[in-house]
Amino acid sequence: MPRPADTYTHDQGHLQNCPEYVAWRVAGNGQELAPTNPYNATGRRAFADSYGFDNSNLDLRPDQEVPTMQRIRSTLDMSKYFDEFFDDSLDHKCARVRCRSCGFVRAKNATRQADHLTQCKDFLATDEGEELMASGSLVHNVQQHQPPAIWNGARPHPDLMVRHLSNHPPSGTVPVGPCSRPEPSRASQRPEPPSLAQHLLDQSDDLLTNAVQHSFLAHAGSGSLSENDFNQWLAQIGYISRSLVPFTGALIGKIRIPETGNLEHDSTFRCLDLLCSAVTNMKKELEFLEATKREYGLEVGLDEPRPATKSFIDLFNSASCASATLLEGMVLLWAVEILFYNSFSYAGSFVAQPMPTQERSSFSLPSYSLPSSASPGAYSGQTIRKDRHTTALREAFIKNWKSENFSQFVDVCKSIVDELAMDQMTGNGRADTSACERVFNQAVWLWAQVFPQTTGIRTGHEDSSRDGGRENKAMNRNRSTGNSVEIEDEYNVQTSTQLE
């Protein structure tokens, strides 16, 4: 038999009293209705008693008030303060109201509408709003006392003893075990990932210190370096700087960018971004070297590359050949950059006072900009100073290669080395690590050989040259007095004695 017309609601009480439904059921259709819900306050108390719950300790004291809310629906006519409309949009499809005072729109709910009126500044500014607030029609009866402690966790169940991982156990509880266990720190929970770059620095600590603290750098910073030694070194640095350009280009040719949904977080793409910036930096650096020579009138001869310089160039070719990995090449590039920075930071520590000239650093992240080059005839018609190479060292070279911007560029190179090591090392990484150690150690050792032996040291004040014989004494005297002093190194002790 088909179901009768749905002219009634689905309320259980209506069905029980509906004659059409009774006749339909008598004909053998449908099934018995579920019994009415007996849940009420009396049933709840009976249920608690049947399971042994004792609610006697929850009785309120005589001085306590039951937290209640005034029946705003029966005392206030919300139609006076809200306009009702039906929202049939796709997202809502419900009855909504709009505040006549401020235009606030929300779903129809008398309690929430009353809550809005208590916070509506436009409504409270009216005379009617002030009257309702004064009469207490919009104020909830706030509970005067704190709820029982069992509801806020101050008195937990004695059978639920929780062991807190802290230095001090909760009050009223007995610590479990002989002593309380301290909470582990964030550092122990999140250990730092292994760093290949830091490993390379640690395993070559002594070798790196000897390379970046060469006696040539101490003389360069203190102002006692001869012009001949400076010109020899600058000529060799020119060969290394020019060789960096094809070396970096070969590394770019090794990059194969994969198909990925997040290209900017791919290590090979980030490496490509760094190498493109490095090529721009190298071009700027070559321009910087030539501009500084012209500006300070430096007479650098066309010396042939020395054996150490040739070995450095061969190392560039070896680390960028087809059999070498991209990681090896990036390790060598970072090694050269950090050798420049650490060396001239060491030389800068010997400068007595900071020069008042503007910083000449041409590095930025990731590339740098160079001030406009000086004209070739900057020294035309002027008397060339004898200490022009010392001035160029302090005002140009040292400031450029120990600047903060260059330091950040070196840090970026280091981070890329670690990213590539995490992504491209194969197996247990032992073979890749050994290859990187070999390249890094060769670069550090060759760097120390590029510096010429400081044989022609320019002397300063007579008294200063006689007082000190060792390098550390000269460092302290130079920093305290600011005078040009003679510094003897372990390679030229006899030569310095003859000069005195």
From Swiss-Prot:
Q: Name one GO cellular component term.
A: nucleus
Compositional bias ranges of the Polar residues kind: 475-484
Alphabetical keyword list = DNA-binding, Nucleus, Transcription, Transcription regulation
- Tell me the segments the record calls region Disordered: 161-197, 457-500
InterPro entries the UniProt entry points to: Haem_Oase-like_multi-hlx, Polyketide-peptide_reg
Which residues lie in Basic and acidic residues bias regions? 459-474
Record field: transmembrane: none
In terms of superkingdom, the source organism counts as Eukaryota
Where does this polypeptide localize?
Answer: Nucleus
Report a single Gene Ontology molecular function. DNA binding
Summarize the protein's role: The two putative transcription factors FPSE_09188 and FPSE_09189 could be responsible for orchestrating expression of the W493 A and B biosynthesis cluster genes. W493 A and B consist of six amino acid residues D-allo-thr, L-Ala, D-Ala, L-Gln, D-Tyr, and L-Val/L-Ile linked to a 3-hydroxy-4-methyltetradecanoic acid polyketide chain.
Could you tell me what this protein is called? Probable transcription factor FPSE_09189
Q: Which organism is it from?
A: Fusarium pseudograminearum (strain CS3096)
Upper lineage = Eukaryota, Fungi, Dikarya, Ascomycota, Pezizomycotina
